[in-house]
Amino acid sequence: MSKGSSTKKWLHEHTSDYYVIQANKLGYRSRASFKILEIQNKYQLFKPNMFVVDLGAAPGGWSEQVIKYIGKNGKLIALDLLEMAPIAGVEFIQGDFSSDETYQKLNTLVNNQKIDCVISDMAPNLSGNKTSDQAKSIYLLELALDFANTNLNKNGSFVAKVFQGQGSDEYLKLVRESFNKVIQFKPKSSRAKSREFYVIATEFKG
């Protein structure tokens, strides 16, 4: 299949996707909003006054939902390599999470406060090389887990997108070392053919 044909196929699938259509109807920023809503409905992670950090946040599908749960007295920091239009109550950092400069900016905003929940929908820019792309994905996941391990409150929680493949089982073992409860969850709003699932980790051991 030519590149042009594959692009047309993706556009058709995207524009006819139920969750894309629903997101447009409801004014959500992306279909990803439904994933975090499913996670919240099932696990009740977000509560008023919580401090949450959203990694890989653009275009804001998760942040726009989470801020509703934590309220005006909560705190939400969102970070992404791409631009993100402002969301009321959300502090945004644009930068590469794997760079020291961006990490320092995030730490400055965190300001030594303990975080209640770290959420990550990060994914690498895909090269088309499955082995390389999977390795990059696991690297970002490890960075997100390291950040959570350093900054979470005792009994805090961690949510991250994982692509099933080389290194994913080993990654889950690392998560289990830090949290008492670790669950694999695939939202209904995930595309059926996608290898993604979400790790829902609660009761951080501290």
Swiss-Prot record:
GO cellular component term of the entry, any: cytoplasm
PANTHER family: RIBOSOMAL RNA METHYLTRANSFERASE, RRNA METHYLTRANSFERASE 2, MITOCHONDRIAL
Key words, A-Z: Cytoplasm, Methyltransferase, rRNA processing, S-adenosyl-L-methionine, Transferase
EC numbers on record: 2.1.1.166
SUPFAM superfamilies xrefs: S-adenosyl-L-methionine-dependent methyltransferases (SSF53335)
Species of provenance: Francisella tularensis subsp. novicida (strain U112)
Similarity remark: Belongs to the class I-like SAM-binding methyltransferase superfamily. RNA methyltransferase RlmE family.
Chain's role: Specifically methylates the uridine in position 2552 of 23S rRNA at the 2'-O position of the ribose in the fully assembled 50S ribosomal subunit.
Pfam families, per database record: FtsJ (PF01728)
Any one GO MF annotation of this record: rRNA (uridine-2'-O-)-methyltransferase activity
Residues the entry annotates as binding S-adenosyl-L-methionine: 60, 62, 80, 96, 121
Protein name: Ribosomal RNA large subunit methyltransferase E
Gene3D superfamilies found in the cross-reference section: Vaccinia Virus protein VP39
Catalytic activity: uridine(2552) in 23S rRNA + S-adenosyl-L-methionine = 2'-O-methyluridine(2552) in 23S rRNA + S-adenosyl-L-homocysteine + H(+)
